[in-house]
């Protein structure tokens, strides 16, 4: 990969992880049809005071609105199409001649829905209108803290904005239930696309869009930093869940071309957010998306990339199965760390050099690099892989050549102060790989049942985190142990599921790690001697049909 060049056309940027149902900003919609709430100061259109939900359509009613049978032209912002029937242009895309629904933010929005949203906006008071407009900058769901930080200013001071939000919610917002375990039970909302379109138009007309988008991007920076801090402090599942839930807004902030300033001025913000979310790309199975976003942001920067940005670029190349492409980036990152005086980045780079050497099968070099990483890394690293990850990497490098040294590395990792977190705060990614090492060591001692139990545990932990590479490696190790135990069909099912996983997640250039290649070759050699071609193909297809999640529960 060459830093400074935009991503190739068609490069995937979607969810290539294993966690399902975490991407949409709204995981459950609670349709609002409750009682009308008190209004705001100001006059209605008929001159009377107050505002109630009965004065205009609720968000639910707007979403359920359908076009009439008359085929009337689409009404946008209260303005119909011209008398000659020309299609109205919305966000650069004309609607159909018969008033067909318009696509907004990837979803079809009917003319009646837009008209109903206009009527609801028109019946709001001044404060509700202003907040309606400002909330249109959010791409996904949001909570009260986000509203206060992004939208509170001027005519909407922080002391009053939450009361305005409560009055506006029944008219323009839908409550959502997307809280994760341990989070404070505070209401969260989502603005339907018809309402958002109306608010975005008014915000632009008012001339406030530029400052609101910038405030939204600064809020996204803080959000990404919070997720990174949670990951480092041991709240790894919470960090992943937070990043996934807020990904619609974070994704917008990671694209410098959507900023009101020049793309080069906002590229640093985009790079910072992308680097802060390193764990989401590296440890949670979204390497392709992270690689695309980082390349895009770096291509718009005017100055040299930071050491951490180059470190992440190299790590993403490695996770994408291109270790040779990671080597030159590692050299650039080292030079950048020396140039910028970023001593903390040196430990990150030593760890990544060890991971790259291990990927390529250079186990002795990998062990040396992991030892250097431990020497360079602080007691409590504030960014990147933990000391526990370095100890586990060292053990993984030694487990097939020096099992006693590998066991000693695992023991040292358990004694390390960084590794002595509570069960809730452990490094779950390193924990999953440690079970792979324990499975290898148990197999070395001839304890196949115990080895299979460790491999199965590693598989489940990697699936839980969403790591495709880790899950594939653990499944292939479990398949080898099943072959050794005489369970040929179960082993073939696991290998078939791994093939499907790698095909669906990685592109054609992906090359598995050398230790995975060796494990796979051992299993397939035995399976080909036990099953003919047709039987083996059928077993692979059956495993692909059932999938790793199902097989992990049965193993």
Mark where each language-model region is.
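Tandem amphipathic alpha-helical repeat scaffolds
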Residues: 230, 270-284, 307-323, 344-362, ...
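C-terminal non-catalytic interaction modules
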Residues: 489-555
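C-terminal boundary/linker of central alpha/beta nucleotide-binding cores
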Residues: 1, 114, 118-206, 210-214, ...
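Loop-to-helix "switch" segment enriched in basic
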Residues: 1-4, 31, 91, 97-128, ...
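Amphipathic alpha-helical segments of tetratricopeptide repeats
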Residues: 254-255, 295-299, 331-342, 371-382, ...
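Short, well-ordered secondary-structure microsegments
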Residues: 129-135, 144-145, 185-187, 196, ...
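Residue signature of alpha-solenoid helical repeat architecture, marking inter-repeat boundaries
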Residues: 244, 264, 268, 304, ...
């Amino acid at each position: 990969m060459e830093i400074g060049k935009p991503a190739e056309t068609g490069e995937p940027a979607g969810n290539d992880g294993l966690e399902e149902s975490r991407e949409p900003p709204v995981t459950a919609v609670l349709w609002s049809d409750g009682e009308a709430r008190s209004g705001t100061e100001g006059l209605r259109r008929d001159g009377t005071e107050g505002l109630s939900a009965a004065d205009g359509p609720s968000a639910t009613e707007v979403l359920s609105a359908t076009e009439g049978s008359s085929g009337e032209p689409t009404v946008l912002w209260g303005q119909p199409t011209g008398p000659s029937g020309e299609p109205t242009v919305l966000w650069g895309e004309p609607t159909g001649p018969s008033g067909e629904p318009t696509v907004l933010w990837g979803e079809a929005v009917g003319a009646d829905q837009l008209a109903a949203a206009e009527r609801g906006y028109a019946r709001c008071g001044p404060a509700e209108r202003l907040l309606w407009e400002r909330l249109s900058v959010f791409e996904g769901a949001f909570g009260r803290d986000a509203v206060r930080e992004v939208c509170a200013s001027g005519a909407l001071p922080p002391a009053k904005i939450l009361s305005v939000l409560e009055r506006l919610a029944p008219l323009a917002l839908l409550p959502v239930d997307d809280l994760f375990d341990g989070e404070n039970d505070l209401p969260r909302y989502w603005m339907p696309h018809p309402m958002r379109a109306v608010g975005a138009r008014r915000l632009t007309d008012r001339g406030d869009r530029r400052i609101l988008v910038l405030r939204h991007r600064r809020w996204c920076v803080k959000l990404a930093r919070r997720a990174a801090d949670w990951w480092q402090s041991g709240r790894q599942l919470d960090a992943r869940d937070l990043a996934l839930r807020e990904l619609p807004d974070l994704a917008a902030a990671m694209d410098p071309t959507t900023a009101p300033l020049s793309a080069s001025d906002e590229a640093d913000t985009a790079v910072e957010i992308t680097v802060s979310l390193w764990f989401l790309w590296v440890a949670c199975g979204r390497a392709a998306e992270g690689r695309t976003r980082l390349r895009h942001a770096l291509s718009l920067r005017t100055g040299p990339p930071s050491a951490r940005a180059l470190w992440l670029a190299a790590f993403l190349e490695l996770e994408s199965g291109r270790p040779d492409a990671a080597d030159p980036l590692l050299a650039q990152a080292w030079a950048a760390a020396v140039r910028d005086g970023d001593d903390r980045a040196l430990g990150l780079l030593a760890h990544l050099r060890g991971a790259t050497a291990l990927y390529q099968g250079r186990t002795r070099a990998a062990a040396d690099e992991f030892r250097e990483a431990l020497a360079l890394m602080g007691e409590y690293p504030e960014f990147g892989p933990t000391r526990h990850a370095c100890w586990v990497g060292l053990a993984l490098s030694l487990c097939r050549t020096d099992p006693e040294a590998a066991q000693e590395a695992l023991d040292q990792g358990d004694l390390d102060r960084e590794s002595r977190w509570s069960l809730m705060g452990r490094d779950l990614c390193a924990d999953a790989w440690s079970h792979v090492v324990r499975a290898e060591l148990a197999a070395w001692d001839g304890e196949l049942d115990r080895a299979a139990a460790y491999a199965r545990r590693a598989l489940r932990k990697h699936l839980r985190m969403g790591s495709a590479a880790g899950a594939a490696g653990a499944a292939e190790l479990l398949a080898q142990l099943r072959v050794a135990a005489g369970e040929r069909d179960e082993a073939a099912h696991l290998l078939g599921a791994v093939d499907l996983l790698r095909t669906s997640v990685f592109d054609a250039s992906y090359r598995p790690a050398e230790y995975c290649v060796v494990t796979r070759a051992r299993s397939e050699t035995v399976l080909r001697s036990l099953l003919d071609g047709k039987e083996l193909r059928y077993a692979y297809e059956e495993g692909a049909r059932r999938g790793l999640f199902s097989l992990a529960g049965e193993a």
